Amino acid sequence: MTNIRKTHPLMKIVNDVFVDLPTPSNISSWWNFGSLLGLCLITQILTGLFLAMHYTPDTTTAFSSVAHICRDVNYGWVIRYLHANGASMFFICLYAHMGRGLYYGSYAFRETWNIGVILLFTVMATAFMGYVLPWGQMSFWGATVITNLLSAIPYIGTTLVEWIWGGFSVDKATLTRFFAFHFILPFIILALAMVHLIFLHETGSNNPTGIPSDMDKIPFHPYYTTKDILGALLLILTLLMLTLFVPDLLGDPDNYTPANPLSTPTHIKPEWYFLFAYAILRSIPNKLGGVLALLLSILILALIPMLHTSKQRSMMFRPFSQFLFWVLIADLLTLTWIGGQPVEHPYVIVGQFASILYFLLILVLMPVTSLIENKLMKW
């Protein structure tokens, strides 16, 4: 008799994803991040659910309700900090996952890659709205500054901003709708992640060499379930270390001051995972130009499959492209650092150089280098 996992309509789906999935035999630990992102998402949904049971989305009580969660709710402080630091872990895994895709040419799976870009936008929107909810100083001013960027859109900008705010400033209506969106978006992310997987399983996984591996596949279970559990344990360990030892390491002290529309913080900045984009936004002295650069810095990812000029898929055997890839990573780290610095010399000029280099690398240097490598291969 056939095993029930292969015949039962629901178990068959799970089986095809986690058990009998043919997987390349040579994928490295960089392929762990997909499952880790799934784990992060489940953790965030669960901790978020318990936080929502005690949180009140009202300007007068939001800050107090977060303090109440931390002080009076059983293990409320653990849930709150798991959720806050879980977001940081989510983005670490997300950026590692994208870096892997860039390095090994996984973007050649166009549908999977494009759904991934949409997922990135959705996760960024969710994280931004979540940051507004504690209603601290940085929550309020972050929401004001970022939503205000939409006013740069010609003709409809101001109307659009006031429509999003639900009034003439960030207020009760804004907080309520942000809470509603912050609650629903993770479930949309979950659905999109399933679509992401469906598209991936149409083609099968890529591998470090970028060469088709149809002749050398192994079942996902037990090989990669075991490998993924190791990654999951390391992720959980890191998250617990952050939460229990340095819960505020990645946060902003300003957010422990209740929101005050009459007092602007000295330096308004988003969470660390948005700083690279924030630095690109600030490096252009024109409002509309900055907003466009900010959008393009993420949207450029959708162009990457079209910018691939190499005859090889992966960068594994392309040393010049590898060098430029690591320059790009260094550039993004520089932008992240600049985004957290005040707007003064020399940070402004460094940020402008780093922003130009970011676009130059992706749009010009990497495609041209790939063409040169193609020529060198003929020698």
Swiss-Prot record:
Its main location: mitochondrion. A ubiquinone binds at residue 201. The chain crosses the membrane at residues 33-53, 77-98, 113-133, 178-198, 226-246, 288-308, 320-340, 347-367. Heme b b562 binds at residues 83, 182. One of its GO terms (molecular function) is ubiquinol-cytochrome-c reductase activity. The keyword S-adenosyl-L-methionine does not apply. SUPFAM superfamilies: a domain/subunit of cytochrome bc1 complex (Ubiquinol-cytochrome c reductase), Transmembrane di-heme cytochromes. Keywords: Electron transport, Heme, Iron, Membrane, Metal-binding, Mitochondrion, Mitochondrion inner membrane, Respiratory chain, Transmembrane, Transmembrane helix, Transport, Ubiquinone. Its cofactor is heme b. InterPro entries: Cyt_b/b6_C (IPR005798), Cyt_b/b6_C_sf (IPR036150), Cyt_b/b6_N (IPR005797), Cytb/b6-like_sf (IPR027387), Cytochrome_b (IPR030689), Cytochrome_b_C_euk/bac (IPR048260), Cytochrome_b_N_euk/bac (IPR048259), Di-haem_cyt_TM (IPR016174). It comes from the Eukaryota. Signal peptide: none annotated. Heme b b566 binds at residues 97, 196. The keyword Membrane applies. It is found in: Mitochondrion inner membrane. GO terms for biological process: mitochondrial electron transport, ubiquinol to cytochrome c. It is a multi-pass membrane protein. Binds 2 heme b groups non-covalently. One of its GO terms (cellular component) is mitochondrial inner membrane. Heme 1 (or BL or b562) is low-potential and absorbs at about 562 nm, and heme 2 (or BH or b566) is high-potential and absorbs at about 566 nm. Component of the ubiquinol-cytochrome c reductase complex (complex III or cytochrome b-c1 complex) that is part of the mitochondrial respiratory chain. The b-c1 complex mediates electron transfer from ubiquinol to cytochrome c. Contributes to the generation of a proton gradient across the mitochondrial membrane that is then used for ATP synthesis. Belongs to the cytochrome b family. The cytochrome bc1 complex contains 11 subunits: 3 respiratory subunits (MT-CYB, CYC1 and UQCRFS1), 2 core proteins (UQCRC1 and UQCRC2) and 6 low-molecular weight proteins (UQCRH/QCR6, UQCRB/QCR7, UQCRQ/QCR8, UQCR10/QCR9, UQCR11/QCR10 and a cleavage product of UQCRFS1). This cytochrome bc1 complex then forms a dimer. This is Cytochrome b. It comes from Balaenoptera brydei (Bryde's whale). The gene is MT-CYB.
